Structures are given as C-alpha cells and as structure tokens.
C-alpha cells in the first residue's frame, strides 16, 4: 500500500472529532475538533493530499493536514440543514457537496475564498452523491427514492426511481465508468450499466437488483480496479460483490454494530471499515481477517477517508 509515510487514514464520528492515523501503525497523529452540534457525515482529502474536507449539520470545514493546527482553515458559509456528502474533482479545482436542503452544490476551490458556483435541485433531501471518473457527471441519491445523473457541463440530467417507498442511502460509480450502483434503506442495491458515445451524457441501462442486506445499506463503493463492489449495513456486515457477475465474494462481520463507512486500498486487496463501536479496522480481504484496530474515538465512527497509490506497478 504505497509509501508508508503517506498512508494516512482519517476518521470522524459522533464524538465531534476527526482523527488522522498512520495507516500502517495504527497510531493517531492528529485530532481535530469538528462542531459540537453535529457528527461527521463524510470526509475527503484534496487531490494534493494537503487538506481534508469534512461535512455535517449546517457545516463544511476544510482542515490543513500539513500543519499542527487543529482548527479548520476554511469554514464554508451559508449551508443549510445536514450536509451529507462531499468530494473533489481530480485536479482540486472544485468540490461538490450534497445535503438535506435538496441541493447538490459545486464549489469553486480556486477562488479566494471558495464560493458556490452551481446548484442542482433534487426536490428532496439528498443523501448521497459521487463524481463520475469522466469528471463531468455527478450521480445523486435522494430520500424520495430518486437517482439522478447530472452533467455539470451541459446541465442535462436523467432521473430514475428504482424502487418506490425507499430512500437512496448511497451511490457509487465504478472507476472504469461501466457501472452505477445505488443502495437503499431496504437493503437492496441496484446496478445500471453506463454507456457514453461521442462525448455525450452517459445513458443508464438497468443491469440488476442485488438483495444485499436484511437492513439499511449505509454505503456502497467500487474498488479501484472496478472488480469489486462493497456494501455496508446496519446489519453488522460488509458484503463484497464481484462485478463480473455480482455474486457475493466475501462477507465481513462486526456483530451488533452498524458499519457506517468503508474504503478500499489502491490495490483492492485491503479494506478499512468504520463502525458504531467507535473502532476503525483494517481487513485483509483474501483471508477475511481483521489485522489492525484504530482505537481512540469515544462514540460511533460514521465516516472515513483513505487514499493511497500503487507503487512500483
């Protein structure tokens, strides 16, 4: 997993703190205060790895990872209700956020200070959003069961409702751009095949429904090599699905706890999980074994961020 000095895991949760860990040792190297009125809903590191963005109830914060400062360096103004997701465009030029105010926002990160430059209205609280690897389309999932695909350049969008009376909890697009996944509060994960021709907006073709869990699905994510899809749940499990036929390959269990978030390593062989017992874990997927615990949070961990690179390919 890359240069060990660069292997930084970030976690946040209900104890209003964000912790930064050396992934290879389990040592906590920095603790940053979030806001006292909110848990951490999502974390993402800037592409240059120097800063960490966090979002929660009526707040978006940006922290400096290279200094000893534990306070945010930027507070984003004018955010209403719960901010549920965020992420960065690959060059770091803009950031997207999604929230329960029904909006997905594009923030210009080159401007000083950063400001909101575009808004998409989903007409319902937005639980999830992710960026297509083409860097122009954003997938979104809302509480009324809608899945949107928004082309930021052309302003075109497509809307699909895969299941009535269900809330979309997370969305993910495979790094190779072939699949879109949307997971809901009934334990189902829907897959669409994505196709794009002549630089036009991607089209969605229904692929399958995976009855993945008995309870809420909290997160779905594809592995960097696009060969695996994970789903995490309130049933205490992480299920790993092979994307060649979407059969279940592995199941990891943290009994009696919700698994709120997870992240693959760059080589797709390792997995980090965040759960309601306040522990982040590193798993070796081949053996389904938990090999390291990251302990220090006093309440549930609800978000994590990990990005490394394959060295010496």
From Swiss-Prot:
GO annotation terms (biological process): positive regulation of cell size; positive regulation of insulin receptor signaling pathway; positive regulation of phosphatidylinositol 3-kinase/protein kinase B signal transduction; positive regulation of transcription by transcription factor localization; protein localization to nucleus; regulation of actin cytoskeleton organization; TOR signaling; TORC2 signaling
WD repeats: 1-33, 35-73, 78-117, 121-160, 163-202, 212-251, 254-293, 296-313
InterPro entries: Beta-prop_EML-like_2nd, G-protein_beta_WD-40_rep, MLST8, WD40/YVTN_repeat-like_dom_sf, WD40_repeat_CS, WD40_repeat_dom_sf, WD40_rpt
A GO CC term assigned to this protein in UniProt: TORC2 complex
UniProt entry tagged with the keyword Repeat: yes
KO phenotype (gene knockout): Reduced tissue growth. Adults display an overall reduction in size with a 25% reduction in body weight, and have smaller wings and eyes. Reduced phosphorylation of Akt1 which is a direct target of the TORC2 complex but no effect on the phosphorylation of SK6 which is a major target of the TORC1 complex.
Subcellular location(s) of the protein: Cytoplasm
Family matches, as SMART domains: WD40 (SM00320)
Keyword presence, Transmembrane: no
The protein's role, per its UniProt record: Subunit of TORC1 and TORC2, which regulate cell growth and survival in response to nutrient and hormonal signals. Essential for TORC2-mediated regulation of cell growth and phosphorylation of Akt1. However it is not required for TORC1-mediated functions such as TORC1-dependent regulation of cell growth, autophagy and phosphorylation of S6K.
Subunit structure: Part of a minimal complex, TORC1, consisting of mTor, raptor and lst8. Interacts with mTor but not raptor. Does not require raptor for binding to mTor. Part of a minimal complex, TORC2, consisting of mTor, rictor and lst8.
Entry protein name: Protein LST8 homolog
Native species: Drosophila melanogaster (Fruit fly)
Gene for this chain: Lst8
């Amino acid at each position: 997993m890359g240069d060990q000095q660069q292997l930084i895991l970030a976690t946040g949760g209900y104890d209003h703190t964000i912790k930064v860990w050396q992934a290879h040792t389990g040592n906590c190297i920095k603790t940053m205060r979030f806001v006292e009125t909110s848990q951490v809903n999502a974390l993402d590191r800037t592409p240059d790895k120097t800063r960490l963005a966090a979002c929660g109830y009526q707040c978006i914060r940006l922290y400096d990872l290279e200094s000893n400062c534990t306070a945010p360096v930027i507070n984003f103004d004018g955010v209403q209700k719960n901010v549920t997701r965020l992420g960065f465009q690959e060059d770091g030029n803009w950031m997207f956020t999604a929230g329960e105010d029904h909006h997905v926002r594009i923030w210009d990160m080159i401007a000083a200070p950063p400001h909101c430059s575009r808004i998409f209205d989903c007409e319902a609280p937005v639980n999830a959003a992710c960026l297509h690897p083409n860097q122009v389309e954003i997938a979104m999932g809302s509480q009324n069961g809608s899945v949107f695909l928004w082309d930021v350049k052309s302003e075109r969008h497509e809307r699909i409702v895969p299941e009535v009376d269900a809330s979309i909890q997370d969305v993910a697009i495979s790094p190779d751009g072939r699949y879109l996944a949307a997971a809901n509060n009934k334990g189902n994960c829907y897959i669409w095949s994505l196709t794009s021709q002549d630089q036009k907006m991607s089209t969605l073709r229904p692929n399958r429904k995976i009855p993945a869990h008995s309870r809420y699905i909290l997160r779905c994510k594809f592995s960097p090599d696009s060969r695996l899809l994970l789903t995490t749940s309130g049933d205490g499990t992480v299920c790993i699905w092979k994307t060649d036929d979407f059969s279940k390959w592995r199941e990891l269990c943290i009994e009696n706890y919700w698994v709120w978030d997870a992240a693959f390593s760059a080589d797709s062989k390792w997995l980090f999980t965040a759960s309601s017992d306040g522990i982040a874990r590193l798993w070796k997927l081949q053996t389904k074994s938990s090999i390291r615990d990251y302990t220090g949070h006093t309440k549930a961990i609800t978000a994590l961020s990990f990005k490394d690179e394959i060295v010496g390919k």
